[in-house]
Amino acid sequence: MVVERFKNSDAAAVYRRFQDKGRMAPEGLLYVSSWVDDKLERCYQLMETADRSLLDEWMANWSDLVEFEVYPVITSKEAAERIAAGAGAERKPA
């Protein structure tokens, strides 16, 4: 999950560049979806890649307009599987 904060609260500059140049994501970095807060100050974007350097490359293309925070995330299903696997290992026989 990528949290983008538009510098100077200038979402318009970000959207202008997007219209002119597209997402500018390198091959191997997949855009999934995004949500923008109603104040047009932050974007919460889900990207997917096995190679963190591709994410860094993409962020460098936007770093003059956007500040980034990156949070590795997994699906709820994956979280449940991890928890179940851990809980199963901790159970003691009766």
Model-found features: residue ranges?
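Short S/T/G/P-rich N-terminal loop/turn motif that feeds into the first structured element of a domain
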Residues: 1-42, 50-54, 74-94
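Conserved short beta-strand edge segments in small beta-sheet-based binding/regulatory domains
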Residues: 65-77
